[in-house]
Regions:
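Long, low-complexity intrinsically disordered regions
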Residues: 1-106, 111-114, 119, 126-130, ...
Length: 179
């Protein structure tokens, strides 16, 4: 361990950012992380209130740091979305069909995919619900259901339970989405 100024190169800006600089950074970070998103989701990614993020998104659109994109929701509605300019190569690959999702993975209910309000429903027609806080009689999917992401689709969810004494993972329930 040592003092910051003795470790970091001289070209690193160590000044504390202003609140405006910090918030702009967080909105950009949210937009980069989400790929394509509703304008409000760029700030929602870091739990920023929309009243604070909206003018930042508008400024980033004017500066062409964020670019407008028109898309379709899962239900067919037209959506006015934004994409960070750093993500344009990925958008081109997706449009060309060369961006391929090849894996199946289990997601945490706390995954950033679900942070933005109703993003899962808008883009995938999937409603992620954390039911561990509900009484057992009101749960639909289980205590701690994990979404299943197969390639680029949320295809279902399952409720696992670890039997600690034996080290056995028990699948309490499995729900697959239609289609």
């Amino acid at each position: 361990y040592d003092l910051t100024e003795r470790i970091l190169p001289s070209w690193v800006d160590t000044r504390e950012p202003s609140l405006d600089e910090r918030d702009r950074h967080w909105v950009e970070r949210g937009a980069r992380a989400l790929g394509i998103c509703l304008p409000r989701h760029a700030g929602d990614y870091t739990w920023m209130k929309v009243t604070r993020s909206r003018p930042i998104v508008e400024a980033l659109l004017k500066e062409k740091v964020l670019l407008p994109v028109t898309g379709k929701a899962e239900n067919g509605d037209t959506l006015e979305l934004v994409i960070h300019r750093d993500n344009l190569p990925l958008l081109k690959q997706a449009a060309d069909g060369t961006l391929k999702a090849e894996r199946t993975t289990f997601l945490s209910p706390f995954d950033s995919l679900f942070w933005a309000l109703r993003r899962d429903e808008l883009f995938w027609g999937f409603h992620q619900a954390l039911e561990c806080y509900l009484p057992a009689s009101k749960r639909v999917y289980g205590y701690f259901s994990l979404p299943i992401l197969h390639k680029d689709c949320l295809v279902g969810r399952f409720d696992p339970k670890l039997e600690r004494k034996t080290g056995t993972l028990i699948l309490k329930s499995l729900f697959l989405e239609p289609g």
